[in-house]
Regions:
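Conserved helicase motor core of SF1/SF2 NTP-dependent helicases
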Residues: 469-472, 481, 500, 541, ...
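Pre-ATPase regulatory/linker segments immediately N-terminal to the P-loop/RecA-like helicase/translocase core
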Residues: 164-166, 170-437, 489-490, 502, ...
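Short, charged beta-turn/beta-strand-edge "cap" motif at the junction between a beta-strand
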Residues: 157-161, 332-337, 557, 786-787
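Short acidic low-complexity segments
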Residues: 130, 142, 534-543, 766-773
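ASCE P-loop NTPase motor cores of helicases and related translocases
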Residues: 209, 354-552, 670-732, 738, ...
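Feature for long, exposed domains in two main contexts
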Residues: 1-285
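Short alpha-helix capping/helix-loop boundary micro-motifs
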Residues: 136-138, 307-317, 536, 765-767
C-alpha cells in the first residue's frame, strides 16, 4: 500500500520514489496510483478524471498544469508523422524558494514518443540559429524556483503510429513528487476524413402527448384513408381475429406486477397463457416505443398524390417505421376539447428521412402548405395477431411434442440404408438424413448444425430424398427470412441429380415483398396476383393442394392456414434456422399443420444468434429463447440421443486455427476442421501477418469512442482507418474485394467504414453487423470492436461491455472467415470479457499479434463481467447499461444508451438487440452504398388484412 502526503479524487501529490501509473480499488472506487515499475500501463482518460483534472488547492505550494488538456473529453488530435507540443507551467505559490530537482519523462507509450525542452519547439517560420540552439531530451536538470514565480517548459509528442500516445511526466520538488499524464490521439488522412462536424446531442425520448388524439371522445369522428395497394388482399377462408389486449392484464403489466400466468414459469399446463402473456408484454413495449415518433405542430409537404413527413434520424430509430404502419393526424389549431375529426392514414413508402403518407381524400383536399398538425404513429398489429392465433392453435398439440421430457415412451427410429443424392455427405450428415426419413411423427427431430458444418446440405438431401423416393410426401419448408428461404430453394432446384418439376414447388411470398428482391430464376416458382403481375399472391386452396414442396418464411406460412390447408396436410415440416425464431413464431407453421404422424425437423444452432425481443421483461421470462433451444435443454436432446438429435461436427469452412477457439468455447471441442489446405493464401499474406501458418491476427489499436449529432451509435475513426489500411494491403496482395467482409457492432461504424472504403478503395466490400453476416462467409473477415474505454459505473459493472459481452455474437463474428480472421480493437478493453480475452491470447500464443502494447495476461472468468446468462438472457439484453427511460434503438443492431455518460444499453450494441437480415428484406430494404444492411427487430402489425411485420422474425405476413 502506498502512502500519500496529500490526496484528492482529482489530483495527487506523492511522497514515494519514481513510480508508474496504475489503478487500485479503495472502497469500491478506482483511483490512479503510482507503482514501482517504470511502466505507466494503460491509462483510460475517459474513465479516470484524476489523469487530467485536479484542484490546485490540494496540490500544495507547487502547482503544475496538465499537458495536452482534453478537448470536449477527448485528447487533442495530430496527424501521424507530425509533432505536437504543449506548454507546462510549474508555479511556486509559496513564500519560499523550492528546488525543482528534476523533470523527467517517466514512461511513454509508444516508447520515446514524448520529449521535454525548456525552449518552445521551433515552428516552420523559426530562424536557423533558433533551430540549431533548440535541445530536447527525456529529462531536465534541477533548478531553483523562486517564490511566486512560474517556470514554463514544453512537452512534445512525435506522432509515431495511429492511436493513443500517452506519457507520464514526473516533477521532483524538494521531497515530493508530482505526476502529470498527457494524452495525444494520432490519426491519418483517412480517419481525419471521417471527422464529424456535428457535436453529439443526447436525443430525448418523446413522451405521449395530446391523449385525446389517440383516445377519441365518444362520438368523435375518425376518418380512415385507404391502405397501401399491396395490403389489399382478397378475403381468406378463415378470418383472423383481433386479439385485443385485455385491459386487466394490460394494467397488471404496466404496473410492473407479475401476471399470474408467469408465476410458475412455463409448464405443460400453462403453455398457451404463458406465451400469450409474453407476447402482450412485447406488444405493450412496442406501443411505448412507437411513441418516440409522436410529433406536434408539424407540417406536411405534397408529393404527387401523397403527403410527406420528415422524420429526422429515421434510419437510426427502433422500431422502424415501415409501409403499412398507421398515422393519426389532427389539425394543431384544434384544441383537445372540441370534436374535430381525427384522420387515420397509412405509410405507403419509407425513404431516407421522410415517409410518404396517404389519408382520406378529405384531408388531402383541404390541406395547404404550411398547415400544422399533431401526429401519432401506430404499428400494424397483423403480425402480432398471427402469433396469438398460432398460440391458440398450439393448444391442441400433444404434450410429448411440446415437452418431450414428459413422455413415457422413448422414440426408436428404424433406419434403412440409402443411396445419397449428394456424393459429399459425411457420416453425421448421412445419419441425420436416415433418421429424418425413418421418423414417423412424434417430437421434433433436431439437426444441430454449428457454423460451416453443412446443415443446408443435410436439409437439402433429406428433402430431395423424400421428394424422389416417397411419392406421397408433402413438404413445408420454412426459414426466418426471405434470403434464407431463397437459399434453400436454390439448393433444391440446382441439384441436377433430381429432376424437380416446377409445378411441384411453390415459393410463397408475402404480397409486400418486392418482385425485384428475388432472383429472376426463382420467379417461375412464385405465384402472382392475377390483375397485377408485379405483386406476389398466395394461391387459392385448390391450387395449394397440388404442390409437393412449399417454401416460405415462418410468418408467411400463416397464409396457408388462412387459405384453408388443414392440419396434417404436410407429411414433413422443415424449419431452418429454428434457433433464430421465438417459440410463438415457430408455432405459426407447426400449430396449424402438425398432426401426430407429421415429421417436424428443426435445424439450426442455439449457440448463434436467436430471436430479437424488445421487451426485456418478456425476454427474461423466455420469449428470447427459441423452441429449438428449449428442446436442446431437455433430457433426450441434451444427452445426444440419436433418435432425437444429430450434431454435425465436421466444419468445411474455417481454417483449423480459426475453428479451434469457438469449438472449445461453444461446442465442447467437438468440431473438426475439414477445410482443404490452403496453398495460395498463406503465400499471399506471408508478409502481412506475423505468422502465416496461424491465420488469426489481432491488431491492437487504442482509438477513441465518438458519437455525433443526435445519433447514440458509437464509432471509432482510428479503427475505421486501420480497417481500410488492412483492406488496401490485402487487395495489393491479390485478394479479391468480394472475398473480404467487415463486421462491426455499431451502425455508425458501419457507415464510417463504408464511407472510407468508397473514398479510398472504391471496391464493393460488404460491411455490416454480426446479424447481417449470419449464414454468410468470406475468405477474409475483419472485425472492428470499436470500444476503447470502460465507464466505471454500476451499469457497466452489471452488464460489462455490451456487444463484447454477448457470447453468441462473438461466436458468429469469428466463424465467418474461411482463411483469415483479423480482429482490430483495444486489447486493454476487450480483455475484460472472457471470450474476447481468450481470442486475444489465442493470437498472442500463436505469435500473431501486432499493434499497441499488451495488458498483463489474466484469466477472466464469468465473475468479471457479472453472472453469465443463457442465450435467451444474453441476446438483446441490456448490455451496456443506462436507464430504460433514455434508451434509443440504433441500426447497428444495438440498443444504445443515450445517457450523457455514453453507456450503451439494449440488445447489440451494442447489442440491445440486433440487426437482422429479416427486417431489411421484408420491412425496409435499406441499402448502404450498394449493399443491404440487415436491420433489427420486429414489430407487430395493424388492423385489417394488410401486410404486417411479425415480431422476432422480421417478416411480413398477410
Amino acid at each position: 500500500m502506498l502512502n500519500y502526503s496529500e490526496q484528492s479524487n482529482k489530483g495527487f501529490r506523492f511522497t514515494s520514489l519514481y513510480y508508474s501509473m496504475g489503478s487500485v480499488n479503495f472502497d469500491d472506487e478506482t483511483r490512479s496510483v503510482i507503482s514501482d515499475v517504470g511502466d505507466i500501463g494503460n491509462v483510460d482518460f475517459a474513465n479516470d478524471a484524476s489523469c487530467y483534472n485536479y484542484d490546485p488547492s490540494n496540490e500544495g505550494p507547487i502547482v503544475v498544469s496538465v499537458p495536452f488538456p482534453l478537448v470536449d473529453g477527448k485528447p487533442q488530435f495530430v496527424v501521424v508523422g507530425e509533432t505536437i507540443f504543449n506548454s507546462v507551467t510549474i508555479e511556486n505559490t509559496s513564500t519560499d524558494a523550492v528546488t525543482l530537482w528534476s523533470v523527467e519523462i517517466y514512461d511513454s507509450k509508444p516508447k520515446d514518443s514524448f520529449t521535454l525542452s525548456v525552449m518552445e519547439p521551433p515552428s516552420p517560420g523559426s530562424d536557423e540559429e533558433y533551430i540549431k540552439s533548440f535541445v530536447e531530451s527525456f529529462s531536465l536538470e534541477d533548478r531553483t524556483l523562486l517564490p511566486g514565480k512560474t517556470l514554463t517548459i514544453w512537452l512534445s509528442c512525435k506522432a509515431m503510429v495511429k492511436g493513443l500516445h500517452t506519457t507520464a511526466v514526473h516533477f521532483t520538488v524538494d521531497d515530493d513528487k508530482i505526476e502529470r499524464v498527457g494524452f495525444v490521439m494520432v490519426e491519418d488522412k483517412i480517419s481525419r476524413s471521417l471527422t464529424s462536424n456535428k457535436p453529439y446531442n443526447r436525443p430525448m425520448r418523446n413522451k405521449p402527448f395530446i391523449p385525446k388524439i389517440f383516445s377519441p371522445n365518444a362520438g368523435q369522428k375518425v376518418i380512415r384513408g385507404s391502405r397501401p395497394a399491396k395490403a389489399n388482399s382478397r378475403p381468406r377462408k378463415y378470418r383472423l381475429l383481433e386479439y385485443k389486449i385485455p385491459m386487466a392484464i394490460r394494467e397488471v403489466i404496466e404496473s410492473k406486477a407479475t401476471p399470474d400466468s408467469l408465476v410458475e414459469g412455463l409448464t405443460e399446463k400453462n403453455y398457451v397463457p404463458f406465451f400469450k402473456t409474453l407476447l402482450i408484454m412485447e406488444e405493450i413495449k412496442l406501443e411505448d416505443d412507437m411513441r418516440t415518433y409522436d410529433m406536434q405542430n408539424i407540417t406536411f409537404k405534397t408529393k404527387g398524390r401523397f403527403l410527406t413527413l420528415e422524420v429526422l434520424g429515421l434510419a437510426e430509430r427502433r422500431p422502424s417505421l415501415v409501409t403499412g404502419d398507421i398515422i393519426i393526424a389532427k389539425p394543431a389549431s384544434h384544441n383537445d376539447h372540441n370534436m374535430s375529426p381525427l384522420y387515420k392514414g397509412h405509410i405507403f413508402r419509407v425513404e431516407a428521412e421522410e415517409v410518404l403518407l396517404q389519408f382520406h381524400e378529405e384531408l388531402h383536399s383541404f390541406h395547404s402548405e404550411g398547415d400544422r398538425y399533431d401526429v401519432q404513429f401506430e404499428y400494424n398489429r397483423l403480425g402480432m395477431r398471427r402469433l396469438y392465433q398460432a398460440l391458440e392453435a398450439s393448444g391442441k398439440l400433444d404434450t410429448e411434442f411440446l415437452f418431450p421430457e414428459f413422455s413415457s415412451n422413448e422414440r426408436l427410429i428404424e433406419t434403412r440404408p440409402l443411396v445419397p443424392i449428394s456424393c459429399n455427405l459425411n457420416e453425421e450428415q448421412l445419419s441425420a438424413v436416415e433418421m429424418i426419413l425413418g421418423c414417423k411423427g412424434g417430437p421434433p427431430y433436431i439437426v444441430h448444425g454449428p457454423p460451416g458444418t453443412g446443415k443446408s446440405v443435410t436439409l437439402t438431401e433429406a428433402i430431395l430424398q423424400l421428394y424422389k423416393t416417397k411419392r406421397n410426401t408433402v413438404i413445408l419448408v420454412c426459414a426466418p427470412s426471405n434470403s434464407a428461404a431463397d437459399h434453400l430453394l436454390g439448393r433444391l432446384v440446382m441439384e441436377n441429380a433430381v429432376n424437380i418439376r416446377k409445378e411441384d414447388v411453390l415459393r410463397l411470398n408475402a404480397t409486400a415483398r418486392s418482385v425485384d428482391d428475388i432472383k429472376s430464376e426463382f420467379l417461375d416458382f412464385c405465384s402472382f396476383d392475377q390483375e397485377d403481375t408485379t405483386v406476389f399472391s398466395c394461391p387459392i386452396f385448390e391450387q395449394l393442394i397440388r404442390y409437393r414442396i412449399i417454401i416460405s418464411t415462418y410468418a408467411s406460412a400463416a397464409l396457408l392456414c388462412a387459405e384453408g390447408l388443414p392440419s396434417g396436410h404436410f407429411t414433413h415440416i422443415f424449419l431452418d434456422e429454428a434457433a433464430q425464431a421465438s417459440e410463438p413464431e415457430t408455432m405459426i407453421p407447426v400449430s396449424h399443420f402438425y398432426r401426430r404422424n407429421t415429421v417436424v425437423v428443426l435445424a439450426g444452432d442455439p449457440m448463434q444468434l436467436g430471436p430479437v425481443i424488445f421487451s426485456k421483461d418478456a425476454e427474461s421470462y423466455g420469449l428470447g429463447k427459441s423452441f429449438m433451444e428449449r428442446l436442446c435443454e431437455s433430457k433426450f436432446y441434451k444427452d445426444g440421443d440419436q433418435n432425437y438429435v444429430t450434431k454435425l461436427v465436421r466444419n468445411y469452412r474455417c481454417h483449423q486455427h480459426i475453428l479451434s477457439l469457438p469449438s472449445e468455447l461453444f461446442y465442447k471441442g467437438d468440431l473438426v476442421s475439414c477445410k482443404e489446405d490452403d496453398t495460395l493464401y498463406p503465400l499471399t499474406w506471408k508478409d502481412f501477418i506475423p505468422n502465416p501458418e496461424f491465420p488469426v491476427l489481432f491488431m491492437g489499436v487504442q482509438g477513441v469512442d465518438e458519437r455525433e449529432g443526435n445519433n447514440p451509435s458509437w464509432f471509432n475513426r482510428i479503427e475505421a482507418s486501420e480497417v481500410v489500411d488492412v483492406i488496401l494491403n490485402l487487395i495489393d496482395k491479390g485478394i479479391k474485394s468480394e472475398d473480404i467482409g467487415v463486421i462491426t457492432p455499431y451502425r455508425q461504424q458501419v457507415l464510417k467504414i463504408s464511407k472510407a472504403l468508397e473514398t479510398f478503395v472504391g471496391s464493393d466490400i460488404k460491411v455490416g453487423t454480426v446479424e447481417s453476416f449470419q449464414g454468410q462467409e468470406r475468405e477474409v473477415i475483419i472485425v472492428s470492436t470499436v470500444r476503447s474505454t470502460i465507464k466505471h459505473n454500476e451499469t457497466d459493472k452489471r452488464h460489462c461491455l455490451g456487444f463484447l459481452s454477448n457470447p453468441r455474437r462473438f461466436n458468429v463474428a469469428i466463424t465467418r472467415a474461411r482463411s483469415l480472421l483479423i480482429a482490430i480493437g483495444n486489447p486493454h478493453i476487450i480483455c475484460k470479457d472472457e471470450h474476447w480475452n481468450k481470442l486475444l491470447w489465442h493470437c498472442v500464443d500463436g505469435e500473431s499479434y501486432k499493434g499497441c502494447f499488451l495488458p498483463e495476461k489474466e484469466e477472466v472468468g464469468e465473475g468479471e463481467c457479472g453472472e453469465q446468462r443463457s442465450y435467451g438472457e444474453w441476446n438483446n439484453k441490456w448490455e451496456e447499461g443506462g436507464e430504460e427511460s433514455s434508451g434509443a434503438w440504433v441500426p447497428s443492431g444495438d440498443w444504445e444508451n443515450v445517457n450523457d455518460n455514453g453507456n450503451d444499453w439494449g440488445v447489440e450494441e451494442e447489442t440491445g438487440s440486433k440487426q437482422n437480415e429479416k427486417e431489411v428484406e421484408s420491412r425496409e430494404q435499406t441499402s448502404y452504398d450498394g449493399w443491404k444492411e440487415n436491420e433489427m427487430k420486429n414489430k407487430g402489425e395493424g388492423e385489417g388484412e394488410g401486410s404486417a411485420w411479425v415480431p422476432s422474425s422480421g417478416e411480413w405476413a398477410m
